[in-house]
């Protein structure tokens, strides 16, 4: 941070008014909009292919219908809750400074559009996933021949089931990239040079909804999962997804609202937020070209995602389903790199002096070729995605040493399993963070002495990574679909023998894809947040110039300087690091509280209905679904308020310099924490799978019980707290970007008003403290049986029949 005030300066002019959307660029953006619509058309084709498959037996259909009903009930209630919140934010955005009312109105309207698109992406993922899972199970059932029938071709059956699952993910991937690109291109077409400011609202809408879907879905899924495992596997000794466990339907619902809806919304907002930063910085660094080129790169990604999704066609020579998925990913990445190279050399000029609309004298006078900067920056993002995929796979796959070591540690008990998993998570966080950091720094160096070009290169690296998002979302959705398919098969009892083995193999591949995509999602979040950090710096520079102040150099006010040696900035840095820990703790505590209620409800049903164990009585699945729904929605408020109000409190209390340090602290700590939580949880999960496959005693052994405990600890790590850090970073950066002009306005110049600053800061702090206090007052102990029973009695048993 201190280095940002030395050779890289903002003292030269950065007026952006000269950049315009030329007629040629307008045509290009319109074509990009058509490409986005084409992605939605392809999604429609894939939906028809998936739904054309058979649904299996009546028992399988009944279980699938229960999962569908529970998922719809949860998301419906969540959307109603978030709808009220979105309307409030819509009007609050109108109060923030803007050049004119047209900009203010556009920012607020596109906030709602961003929120709607994010919710649509998540809902679409959930809607199709809960319909395709039974079709995957039905396809696998074909592997077991009926009496008198010849043996089936297991490879062909496995490939059919896998294709259904991956095409489901392809639909979600196409919606993610299609809606993200459509929203951004529409803003550019309507607002032209003002588009970056309006896109801030679009990005905030996408980010807020994604964070709530991530946190809420994560709490729901892991409360049900942990509760089901503790009572079912550990206490009752019954298998996973056993129909006698009242939490199994809620567990399957959670897979969809957490992994499908949550991840889709998460990557959609990464898409939107990265485009926001790239257009803001591109307008300053590349002038007229900067309003179109950041859209060209992800448009190429849409086309290559289509190729990658259809390239995932299993072959007989493949060692596993993962081979086909890796092939699709790398085909998409290679095609993206090649097409971006063509686009760069066709679209961009060969000299910085030929970039129209750039008023920064230093950029116009710079030697070198802007095409090289653009090409290398995008390549860094694409290569980073591939490296993160391999690194995450190393620490989480069952065939690699880290997971095998955790599996071996199960021979000495649960404590050593937990310790080994923590060790793997901590170590993997270092390597992943260094890899992401090198990627960001490598892109930054491309700018030379120009801070604006350096920051734009970081944003372009983010757009390069986004070229793989379509396939990444497909890979992630594949996981819960295959997991749910296995659950439906086990609960129905209609898929046995070879068919059950097909689903077991698919589930193992799905666990790996989920772990890998979490790593890449973290990388996209960090690059997006880093690019937004650059946009934030540009915003405070512009705001400071408007009130006649300088950001750096002699005479610059202390709390405008991005200098870590200043006490207020150091406090901001520490606060940014601390908020990540608080956010993670709140998320894990929420799972613990909800899981406690689930545990006591499932225990109550086993105690009061002994016929459940011999199948003479039916568990009340709906009660557990409703407990998870109510708890997840109740727990949303505190993390959400923390993410939005903490930057406001820091900014209005300590100034924009400290707020910049706060963002830097959050990005650094958030990167390490997110990777640690995701990889340790993924490693514990696959260590359990390793033992269940027959190693170290297999199912029912003491080693298996130890790995179940490790997996239970890892569940809220990898599926609640870890993934929720991604949108947290982007929400805080966007809030800082939006409030920066207001902080400067009330701190300097004619509108300086200390009273307003203090009032806003105190109000924000009081709300945060109050929300955390209320959250902490709720019982955290799993043994709080009275609290669990109160929750149980208030549950509505009619959610799922």
Swiss-Prot record:
Determinant of potassium independence (site feature) positions: 514
Pfam families for the chain: H_PPase (PF03030)
Membrane topology type: Multi-pass membrane protein
Calcium recorded as keyword: yes
Positions with a binding annotation for Mg(2+) 2: 252, 255, 483
Record localization: Cell membrane
Sites where the protein binds substrate: 222, 718
Disulfide bonds: none
Protein origin, superkingdom: Bacteria
Single annotated GO MF: diphosphate hydrolysis-driven proton transmembrane transporter activity
Site residues by UniProt (Important for ion transport): 214, 259, 266, 719, 730
Record-level GO cellular component terms: plasma membrane
Major enzyme class: translocase
Necessary cofactors: Mg(2+)
Chief location: membrane
Reactions mediated catalytically: diphosphate + H2O + H(+)(in) = 2 phosphate + 2 H(+)(out)
Its EC number(s): 7.1.3.1
Residues where Ca(2+) binds: 685, 711, 715
NCBIfam families linked to this entry: PRK00733.1-4, PRK00733.3-5, V_PPase
Self-association state and partner proteins as the record states: Homodimer.
Function: Proton pump that utilizes the energy of pyrophosphate hydrolysis as the driving force for proton movement across the membrane. Generates a proton motive force.
Family the entry assigns: Belongs to the H(+)-translocating pyrophosphatase (TC 3.A.10) family. K(+)-insensitive subfamily.
UniProt-recorded name of the protein: K(+)-insensitive pyrophosphate-energized proton pump
Organism encoding this protein: Streptomyces avermitilis (strain ATCC 31267 / DSM 46492 / JCM 5070 / NBRC 14893 / NCIMB 12804 / NRRL 8165 / MA-4680)
């Amino acid at each position: 941070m201190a280095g940002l005030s030395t050779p890289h300066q903002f003292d030269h002019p950065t007026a952006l008014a000269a950049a315009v959307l030329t007629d040629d660029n307008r045509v290009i953006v319109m074509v990009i909009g058509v490409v986005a619509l084409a992605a939605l058309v392809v999604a429609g084709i894939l939906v028809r292919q998936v739904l054309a498959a058979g649904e299996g037996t009546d028992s399988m259909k009944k279980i699938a219908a229960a999962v569908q009903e529970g998922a719809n009930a949860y998301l419906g209630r969540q959307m109603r809750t978030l709808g009220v919140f979105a309307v409030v934010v819509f009007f609050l955005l109108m109060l923030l400074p803007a050049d004119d009312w047209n900009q203010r109105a556009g920012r607020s309207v596109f906030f709602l559009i961003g929120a709607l698109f994010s919710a649509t992406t998540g809902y679409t993922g959930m809607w199709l996933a809960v319909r395709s899972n039974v079709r995957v199970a039905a396809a696998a059932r074909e592997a077991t021949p009926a009496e008198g029938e010849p043996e089936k071709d297991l490879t062909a059956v496995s490939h059919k089931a896998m294709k259904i699952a991956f095409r489901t993910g392809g639909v979600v991937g196409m919606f993610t990239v299609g809606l993200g690109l459509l929203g951004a291109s529409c803003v550019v077409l309507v607002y032209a040079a003002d588009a970056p400011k309006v896109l801030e609202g679009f990005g905030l809408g996408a980010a807020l909804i994604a964070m709530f879907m991530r946190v809420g879905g994560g709490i729901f899924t892991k409360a049900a999962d942990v509760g089901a495992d503790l009572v079912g596997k550990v206490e009752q000794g019954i298998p996973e997804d056993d129909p006698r466990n009242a939490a199994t339907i809620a567990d399957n619902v959670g897979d969809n609202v957490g992994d499908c809806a949550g991840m889709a919304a998460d990557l959609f907002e990464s898409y939107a937020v990265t485009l926001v930063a790239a257009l803001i910085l591109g307008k300053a660094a590349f002038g007229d070209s900067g309003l179109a080129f950041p859209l060209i790169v992800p448009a190429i990604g849409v086309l290559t995602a289509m190729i990658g999704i259809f390239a995932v066609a299993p072959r007989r020579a493949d060692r596993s389903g993962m081979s086909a998925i890796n092939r699709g990913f790398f085909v998409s990445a290679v095609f993206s790199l090649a097409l971006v190279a063509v686009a760069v050399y066709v679209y961009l000029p060969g000299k910085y002096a030929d970039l129209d609309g750039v008023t920064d004298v230093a950029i116009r006078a710079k030697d070198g070729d802007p095409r090289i900067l653009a090409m290398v920056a995008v390549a860094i993002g694409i290569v980073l995605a591939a490296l993160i995929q391999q690194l995450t796979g190393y620490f989480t796959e069952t065939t690699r040493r880290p997971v095998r070591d955790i599996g071996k540690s199960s021979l000495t008990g649960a404590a050593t399993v937990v310790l080994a998993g923590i060790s793997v998570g901590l170590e993997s966080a270092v390597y992943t963070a260094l890899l992401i950091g090198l990627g960001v720094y490598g892109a930054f160096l491309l700018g030379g002495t120009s801070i604006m070009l350096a920051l734009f290169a970081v944003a372009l690296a983010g757009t390069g990574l986004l070229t793989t998002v379509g396939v990444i979302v497909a890979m992630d959705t594949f996981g819960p679909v295959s997991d749910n398919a296995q659950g439906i098969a086990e609960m129905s009892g209609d898929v046995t023998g070879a068919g059950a083995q097909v689903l077991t193999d698919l589930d193992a591949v799905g666990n790996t894809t989920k772990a890998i995509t979490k790593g890449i999602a973290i990388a996209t979040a960090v690059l997006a947040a880093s690019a937004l950090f650059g946009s934030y710096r540009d915003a405070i520079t512009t705001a400071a110039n408007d009130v006649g102040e300088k950001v750096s150099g002699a005479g610059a006010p202390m709390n405008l300087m991005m200098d870590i040696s200043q006490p207020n900035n150091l406090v901001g840095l520490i606060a940014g690091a601390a908020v990540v820990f608080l956010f993670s703790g709140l998320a894990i505590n929420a799972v613990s509280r909800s899981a406690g209620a689930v545990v006591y409800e499932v225990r109550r049903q086993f105690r009061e209905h002994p016929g459940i164990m011999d199948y003479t009585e039916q568990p009340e699945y709906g009660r557990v679904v409703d407990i998870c729904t109510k708890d997840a929605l109740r727990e949303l408020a505190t993390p959400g308020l923390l993410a939005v109000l903490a930057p406001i409190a820091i900014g209005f209390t300590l100034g924009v310099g400290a707020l910049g340090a706060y963002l830097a602290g959050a990005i650094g700590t958030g990167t390490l924490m997110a990777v640690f939580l995701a990889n340790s949880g993924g490693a514990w999960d696959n260590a359990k799978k390793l033992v269940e496959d027959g190693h170290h005693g297999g199912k029912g052994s003491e080693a298996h019980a130890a790995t179940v405990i490790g997996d239970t600890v890892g569940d809220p790590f990898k599926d609640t707290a870890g993934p929720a850090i991604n949108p947290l970073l982007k929400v805080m950066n966007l809030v800082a970007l939006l409030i920066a002009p207001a902080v400067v306005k009330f701190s300097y110049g004619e509108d300086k008003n200390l009273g307003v600053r203090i009032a806003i800061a105190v109000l924000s702090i009081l709300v945060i403290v109050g929300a955390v206090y209320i959250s902490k007052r709720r019982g955290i102990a799993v043994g709080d049986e009275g609290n669990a029973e109160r929750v149980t009695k208030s549950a509505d048993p009619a959610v799922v029949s």
